[in-house]
Amino acid sequence: MKRARGLAVASVMSVAAVFAAMTPAQAASNDGTCNTDEACIYRLLDYSGGIYDTLSSKKSYSGLVFHGTSTTIDNKASSARNKDPDNNLWFYQLNNWAGDTWGLPAGSSTNFNGPDDNKWSSHCWTGATAGCPGG
């Protein structure tokens, strides 16, 4: 009886291990893929060139680079996608959510053309229609 119970427990554990391995991975920031809930910032127009993808608001782009490159994203963004279905994404010209702004509604994308190309230094999400805390 003890042996049968031991085999049953081992079988259940094996099945649990298989299902755990089949669970989808969570999105990872800056993995080079624009996943649900992320801000995806692109080096070039039309969502091309290097990509920086993140699940977090950033008060400063200083030191951040496009995935797989050494190119910093500060003042080098030409297009973006807001993959968060619920919150607006706000881009700021300066660090600490200051300066000119560009609001990107939940679930939308944009090209930063003309004077707004290569301008952004921080971003945050908010459910509000105007800006970030302290911005």
Model-derived segments and their meaning:
Residues 2-13, 18-135:
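Compact beta-sheet-dominated domain cores in extracellular/mature segments
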